[in-house]
Amino acid sequence: MIKLLTSQKIIIASILSKFLIFFLGKKKRKIIRNKINYLIDLNEGIDLGIFLNIKNEKKIYNIKKILKNEKNTCLIDIGANIGSVTLPLAKLFDRSSIISIEPTKYAYNKLKLNLELNSKLKKRIKTFNYFISNNRKKVKYVHSSWNFSKDESKHKIHFGSLKKTSDKSVSLDNLIKKIKKKINFIKIDVDGYELEVLKSGYKFISKYRPIIHIEFAPYLHKNFGYSTDELINFIKKKIHYDFYNENFKKVKNVATHVAKIKNRSENFFLINKKDREKFKD
């Protein structure tokens, strides 16, 4: 299967967006997908994906095969954006609660609106407009929310618009201290900031070994002052996790595999070496 570059996906999505807006009229509209209500803007990438029922992270829901749907358990969505994963996870794990974290004020406001449209799911979702970091030096702006309008501040490769982040920055370890439930799954989609997020949750991750679903965007890592090799080494040697693809097949030569990810991103499941029996190699 041909894997498109991020820029190619955005160009195709932009053409589709213009086509739909021309024929349907309104950019903003309420829709229902898989019995979940959304308020979307057809001029934005994630929203368009929801409208077309294209789930870029659809294989994340394979986690249902190995993760129990239990009371008093919690799943964490870091980089929740408008709720495209938070809401389906809440529907899929209807006995669990969801912690939904989005750093940009723009996307967070859209997330809250989408939760209001889903009152039953909302009861089990706790949201935070926090920037998750191990570094006290706060990142004030990040490229996020893929708007198809022209904007000179957009990222040169993935075309994300520059958005202001929350004034509140917290480590994952400190945030988790406030949660009185068992956390067995963490989803991380932070556009290159993966190492900082993992470091900020080092104590918790090392002790409790949650399953992690992570988006790897190697072309963005240098923007945050680290190399992809540093991230791989932290995962394999510091927190002692192995890499699996989204069909639960172990990635044996991670460095070689990741080196082939050029100007795009790829998702992985991470699982602690002590828990490898949960996956089939």
Predicted regions and their residues:
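Conserved short loop/turn motifs at secondary-structure junctions
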Residues: 103-104, 146-152, 219-220
